[in-house]
Amino acid sequence: MHLVDITMFYAAEGGGVSTYLNTKARWLATRSQLRHTIASPNVRSGSTAPTLVNIPAVPFPGIHGYRMPLSVATPARILHALQPDLIEAGDAGPCAWAALRAARRLKIPAVAFYHSDLPRLLAHRFGALAMRGASNYLARLYRQFDMVLAPSRLMVQQLAELGIAGALHQPLGIDLGVFCPQRRFTTLRRHLSLAPETRLLVYAGRFTAEKKLALLIEAVCALGQPYHLLLVGGGAALPRLPQITYIPFKRDQQALARLLASCDVMVHPGDCETFGLIVLEAMACGLPVVATGGAVAELVDANTGLLVRPNSVDSLAEGIDAIFHQDLAALGANARRKAQELYDWNLIMPQLLSRYDGLLGSCQHAGLDAGPICVSD
């Protein structure tokens, strides 16, 4: 049995899609009857852990360092040569059309995973007309797939509004052994030359417009001392201010987990996430979360943090201040418990394989070693 993922959103620099695919690769590697290949423009062919295949592509402005194929034909030929039994497309560009073309020729199922809220992202940048165009495009594309998965109920609802009524809720998961409160080290404040009483906030991810980091920086500056913001990642240039510390992206997940666990509160100001994996990673490390909405709101509730109005500096600042007047230890323990009970990869991956199993048919059931689906749609 050969499963192939193709996406322009897989890269060594990490991100939610990369974490998902790397975890899938490790999971499938323990099942000797299964082969798994990741095809992406952002890798070199030849790696075997995971197995990677390069898709010829060029840098594309506005997609933050990722590369995009110039045609559908070349990636479709590469997919056909891999002879998969199932293809999953992790973006809505040429890779998705290539997956459809190869799947039709091979007479195999094609799955789409909706990792990026394209209409809303384009609306933020180009307005309502671009949003309508993206919505029409996605509807035309995704109706041709045998299955469409979305990581949050909000995204399932949005796809239904586009006319894709059969989309299924398939959340992502967390490595609870890597992301855990035990990663905390008490010397982080001293290492950053901060006072012991500093209230340490953290954001990790790409520095892009849709993450709304300017909003977060303004809120932290409005709060003043003793608040300090740790920004982990890279991308667009952001202001250098005394209350902000920048740390480059951490490819090593254990290093990222140590940083997360050593802070007080995760703050996520963006409202365009389809899931919010970094928020879940922080929760697994025992951090309460202040968030603004979108799919992240499905992870955060009154027992694990606070939700504030999106696009409001005042609301974000008030929420950050308010959470420090609550029991942070209790909120963090609740956050960890929620991650354990609902989002362990050991629960999520069998659910995903059950989705695949339904497409492949009972004759190949033994090949997938699928478990029951426990996620309610």
Label every PLM stretch briefly:
Residues 1-54, 221, 374-377:
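N-terminal subdomain of nucleotide-sugar transferases
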Residues 4, 195-211, 217-220:
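Conserved donor-binding/catalytic core segment of Leloir-type glycosyltransferases
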Residues 79, 142, 258-263:
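Short alpha-helical donor nucleotide-sugar binding micro-motif in glycosyltransferases
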Residues 136-185:
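Donor nucleotide-sugar binding/catalytic pocket of nucleotide-sugar-dependent glycosyltransferases
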Residues 237-254:
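Nucleotide-activated donor-binding/catalytic signature segment of Leloir-type glycosyltransferases, i.e.
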Residues 249, 302-313, 321-327:
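Conserved acidic donor-binding segment of nucleotide-sugar-dependent glycosyltransferases
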Residues 271:
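Aromatic "clamp/platform" in nucleotide-sugar-dependent glycosyltransferases that forms part
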Residues 288-291:
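Short hydrophobic beta-strand element within catalytic cores of glycosyltransferases
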